[in-house]
Amino acid sequence: MATEGLLSAETDQDVARFLANFPPTEWGYSFASLLPQDSEFESHTKELDLVKEKVKDMLMQSRKELTENIEFVNCLCRLGVSYHFESEIIEQLSHIFISLPKILEENDYSLYILTLLFRVLRQHGYKMPCDVFNKFKDSNGEFKKCMTADVRGLLSLYEATFLSVHGEDILDEALAFTRQHLETLAEKSSPHLARHIRNALHLPFHHAPERLEILQYICFYEGEKSMNETLLKFAKLDFNRLQLLYRKELGLLSRWWKDINLTEKLPYTRDRIVEAYAWAAGIIIDPQFSRARLQFAKHLILISVMDDTYDSYGTFDELKHFTAALQRFTFEPTIELPEYMKFLYNILWNFFQETEKDETQGCACKTSFAREMLKELARSYFAEAEWYNDGVLPTFDEFMQFGLVSSTFDYHASAFFLGVEDLGMKEFIWLRDNPTIAKTAKLFGRLFNDIAIREDEQKKGDYPSAIKCYMNDHDVSLEKAKEDILKMLEDGWKDMNEELMKPTTVPKILTKFSINFVRMSDFTYRGGIDKYTCGTELKEFVKKLTIFPLQI
């Protein structure tokens, strides 16, 4: 069916539509033409394995001295290669944490080492107490001014503050103190260190997407006087090997996208397969989850099309029938749907049918749950469309009831579960029960998005958003509403951090997915720009992630 055939009925009826005029894709070529050979990946793996044994020996040798051990573990984490030695690292950190009272009593560590120890333990779930930083305060309860002479120690303290939980006032004070002085110190430092400081001030390590942070740290580490050549080579080999895997996955995704032909059939929607894959790789970073990344990216692309249909093209009556059809989700959609919606409906139907047929991975019951998430998402999208159609601005709480669903966290978590064989109904039940870490991730997904509402969305008029509802509820300005919502997000990070601390009943794979979803939401909408829609903002990140290898 030609494009004109799908959309002509609406044109003939002269239906008034809001057209968002999304920017075209930034990618003028298909990644399907850039598929690497399997032999290339195997060659990288062999070379990596040779160096891996040397790095493992270094890790085991570092146990003799705590400062050396914690610095080496930190390097492994920040260079993106700690997953190779996960069991060894957990064993070492567990031993340190158990012995921590004695260690702190017998040693007077520097600001740099103490903050590094604090951050590394906390990022692995060990809740080291924050009162260890009282030693850096003067008799007036203020942080000592002499600390500003230790630039690396100050930067390490700054990074440590982002792992705080509620009630840790000293870390809130430390954040304000370090941020103020680091902004000045960046001007006085060497270009090498200044760039590292500015990257941290823009997006701290704990909040940054892992692959972006890893790339930045490899570049920084290469310029360090204390750089270990073997460790640097290992990190670069690992980065380049994963890059080949990511490029292969993006090539397969490009073929799928070409086959379903959505941009020709539905030209009003965003063509963002590369950006969708960047999200998948930013959230699901471990190499063994290739299938999960592809599942996630495909679901994200289809949900983007649905979102554009609800927000930017469909009429209210069309959306009403489309939502009802999705609630039934049978083979034949209702005849009341226009042709373009029937096409979209059939794409969704066929996609879920193909997933459900994959019995070898035991997906049938998981696909059923994901289908229910799709129905819930459609109801949420329609509720927002109904408010707009009726000229109703809901309260902030009413909006968030549906807005947390339209954050898409639940839907994308279910897509992730579909791609991981070891995850089953137990994890879906966890998601359905709405634990704190999931609620927090949804809060971030919704509020970050609404802070970065595009100008074309603003032109649509009183389309509800969290910002507008909050302004109306509290009779405050746009600036004040954003300030208050950013405070909610700061508190949300503390909630998230608390959920990461041991003991926890949540499997690590789920906490990692949740926090990486938050990191990608933060990165995508930081600065008030929707980098997913405005693809220029993500282009360099994607190139570095998938195209340009690091020189070894």
From Swiss-Prot:
Signal peptide: none annotated. It is an enzyme of class 4 (lyase). Catalyzes the cyclization of farnesyl diphosphate to multiple sesquiterpenes, such as olefins and sesquiterpene alcohols. Transmembrane segments: none annotated. It comes from the Eukaryota. Pfam families: Terpene_synth, Terpene_synth_C. Mg(2+) 1 binds at D307, D311. Its cofactor is Mg(2+). This is Terpene synthase 5. Belongs to the terpene synthase family. Mg(2+) 2 binds at D307, D311. Binds 3 Mg(2+) ions per subunit. InterPro entries: Isoprenoid_synthase_dom_sf, Terpene_cyclase-like_1_C, Terpene_cyclase_plant_C1, Terpene_synth_N, Terpene_synth_N_sf, Terpene_synthase-like, Terpene_synthase_metal-bd, Terpenoid_cyclase/PrenylTrfase. Keywords: Lyase, Magnesium, Metal-binding.
